[in-house]
């Protein structure tokens, strides 16, 4: 899954509820986590590569 498709998935989440995403292939996870949080998402790290993402808005 490309990083852009994960961003689109996160945008869809803003209209739904919670999703679990695999971030194993993302090179800069810190930047990605910042991106999600700055767009109103709550990030819970289930493992190093599996995150639960919930819209907080």
Swiss-Prot record:
Origin superkingdom: Viruses
This protein's name: Uncharacterized protein ORF9
Originating species: His1 virus (isolate Australia/Victoria) (His1V)
């Amino acid at each position: 899954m490309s990083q852009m498709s994960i961003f689109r998935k996160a945008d869809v989440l803003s209209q739904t509820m919670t999703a679990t995403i695999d971030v194993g292939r993302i090179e800069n996870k810190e930047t990605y986590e910042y991106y999600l949080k700055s767009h109103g998402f709550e990030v819970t790290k289930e493992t190093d590569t599996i995150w639960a993402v919930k819209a907080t808005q």
